[in-house]
A protein has these predicted regions:
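Extracellular/periplasmic carbohydrate-active domains that bind, remodel
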Residues: 1-115
Length: 115
């Protein structure tokens, strides 16, 4: 629903996002991102209903969010294969005071990682 690519100095705060057909918030190759006080609502039986999927990003703060996800609640991804190696890892990710309900995994690392 919200996809950010190669962005800097972003604040997502105090919004409710629900019933995305796939992942809800997807920052990719971003730097200096804060996701604060966001509510994600997704049916428990939704496929690929990830809450927040951070990929190849740095200096990210995920704080005070409530996530009701059909799949992964908060997920770190580095990309698969050669694209993952070329785009770089997730670096300096800080996750604090989040509530995750009904997810297959509250916090997940490694579903797409190279190297």
């Amino acid at each position: 629903l919200i996809r950010l690519t190669s962005c800097e100095n972003i604040l997502i705060q105090g919004v409710t996002i629900q019933n995305s057909p796939k992942f809800h918030i997807v920052p990719q190759k971003c730097n200096n991102l804060i996701i604060d006080g966001v509510t994600v609502r997704c049916p428990w039986n939704a496929q690929n209903g990830d809450g927040i999927d951070v990929g190849n990003s740095s200096n990210v703060l995920i704080i005070n969010n409530t996530i009701d996800a059909g799949d992964d609640g908060i997920c770190m991804k580095g990309g698969a294969g050669n694209s993952g190696l070329a785009n770089g890892p997730c670096v300096n990710i800080n996750i604090q005071n989040n509530k995750v309900y009904h997810a297959h995994g509250g916090f997940v690392i490694g579903s797409e990682f190279s190297g």
